[in-house]
Design a protein with these regions (language model features):
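Conserved catalytic-site loops of classical short-chain dehydrogenases/reductases
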Residues: 46-48, 85-89, 127
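Short alpha-helix in the Rossmann-fold core of NAD(P)-dependent oxidoreductases
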Residues: 65-69, 88, 108
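Terminal hydrophobic/aromatic helix or amphipathic segment near a protein terminus
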Residues: 205-256
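Active-site beta-alpha turn of Rossmann-fold NAD(P)-dependent dehydrogenases/reductases
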Residues: 51, 88-92, 130-132
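NAD(P)H-binding glycine-rich loop region in Rossmannoid oxidoreductase-like domains
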Residues: 8-81, 96-98
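Amphipathic terminal alpha-helices
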Residues: 256-305
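Oxidoreductase cofactor-interface core, primarily capturing Rossmann-like NAD(P)-dependent enzymes
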Residues: 1, 6, 12-15, 82, ...
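Non-catalytic, hydrophobic alpha-helical segments
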Residues: 47, 170, 174, 190, ...
Length: 305
């Protein structure tokens, strides 16, 4: 089956290389214009959107209203117009439960509602995939924090549970939804095979890294986050940036105080992902040391880097 990967920017070269290696054709679109999707989606039988705002510190053209809501709606509506038989949207795990508490969740749920309505009207299958949290999210936050600072942060007491999932396993699950009509036209909350508390994730990272001393765990009280969110909400009456920050804080409060356990899919394990990241760091350090040795100037004793 030919695959066309639609990207909204060219900033991530690693993703482009990986997609090309898998045999996908790449198309770049302006996510702010519905016309931009028309050519890319022409003739598509199945359209899958994983679009989400890149990180928590974004401006108005790349925040959750612009991407999670508006860009996804443009994509979904154009996919239906283009004649797709199946539209798949990757959404947040807790979105339906937390949308009334935070605009961060409501943004993606607005896309779920709008695309779902368009698909029902057109007789198109609509599937929603809700992963708990990707390994990459935890690697970038937990692992890197423990590795660089020997410190780890939890919201509340860190006792709430989650079964994070490998992105490759989610991709395989989506492929199953395409191949098996019984899995289509449904919502799926998916996670990985292992359940952790948020505190245990930091301890796992410390164990894999081989942290020489005890891990410093900093617990941020929920009351403090609620206070900051309330202040940001007030300032948000006159500042879009503060309104955005308040929404993200309320989402963090919800996510950090509720379990997120999805149906186990795949075989990828967080401990193996952490070990892979650790081994990668060791290889980089080894190559750097070799480069210093090879480039040493014997005359001056200085490194030519």
């Amino acid at each position: 089956m030919p695959v066309l990967a639609i990207l909204k920017d060219k900033s991530c070269e690693a993703a482009q290389v990986k997609l090309n290696a898998l045999g996908a054709t790449l198309a770049f679109v302006d996510a702010s214009r519905i016309e931009s999707f028309a050519q890319a989606l022409a003739g598509a039988e199945t359209a899958i959107s994983c679009m989400a705002s890149g990180n928590l510190h974004v401006d108005s053209i790349d925040d959750f209203w612009a991407i999670d809501r508006d860009a996804n709606i443009r994509f979904g509506l154009e996919a239906v117009r283009a004649g797709a038989k199946h539209v798949i949207l990757v959404a947040t795990f807790e979105g339906r439960d937390s949308r009334r508490l935070t605009e961060f969740s409501d943004a993606k749920e607005c896309a779920v509602d709008a695309i779902g309505a368009a698909c029902r009207q057109a007789g198109v299958a609509f599937t929603v995939i809700r992963p708990t949290a990707y390994f990459s999210d935890l690697t970038n936050r937990a692992f890197d924090s423990v590795l660089k600072r020997g410190r780890y942060t939890v919201i509340g007491d860190g006792s709430h549970r989650i079964n994070p999932v490998d992105g490759d396993d989610v991709a395989a699950f989506i492929a199953d939804c395409i191949d098996d009509p019984r899995m289509a036209d449904s919502e799926h909350q998916v996670g990985g095979p292992d359940i952790f508390t948020f505190r245990a994730i930091g301890l796992l990272a410390a164990e894999v890294i081989g942290l020489p001393g005890p891990l410093k765990i900093r617990a941020i009280p929920l009351w403090l986050l609620r206070l900051v969110a309330a202040l940001a909400t007030i300032v948000g009456l006159v500042s879009q940036r503060s309104r955005r920050s308040a929404a993200i804080l309320r989402w963090m409060i919800y996510s950090g105080s509720h379990d997120a356990i999805g149906v186990s899919c795949g075989t990828g394990r967080l401990c193996d992902d952490f070990r892979s990241k650790r081994d990668g760091q060791i290889r980089v350090a080894s190559l750097r040391n070799e480069a210093i040795t090879l480039d040493r100037d014997p005359g001056s004793g200085r490194h030519q880097l």
